[in-house]
Amino acid sequence: MTKWFAYILLASVCLLLSCGGKSVREKFAEADRLVNENNLDSAAWLLEEQITLSALSDSDKAEYGRRLAWLHLLQGRSLVNDSLIDYSVDYYKEHASEPLLSAYFVKAIYMGDSRKGLEQRRALYREAIDSAYSRSDSTYLVRFYDRLTSLSFGEGLYRETIAESKEWEEIGRAHV
């Protein structure tokens, strides 16, 4: 009798523990809602304190990295510690996932905050432009060309800036 009671008690505890929390996707949706309502601190608390990174699947880890870096960007926080965005970009490239372009955008900003080399940043923008072009995403094409030409101009690379601007103009004509 005691043995059966112990089994029933153990099964009940396991059942209660498994039903207790929200799924990671529900937490992501809740964080999105909080961001849309401009409750950035609450969204940060949810992502940073309520999600255990080591328990996430690969796809959830990529999504977590992209969302957290984007949130830090919206909060005006330094992105120096958001190296998980590298994982997100690599995962989305490997799986040809939809969030790739937004992950590129956040990674480019992260690279600027971490003072990565100029050529690394230019190469990232080139890669992002190619990806946006292959997806026919004119919004991200404009964003990435704008960032690339601004970076080149800011570094005094005037010939490159002119060449990139002409390339941007040609692509614009092709999409019209």
How would you label these PLM feature ranges?
Residues Y7-L16:
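Bacterial N-terminal signal peptides
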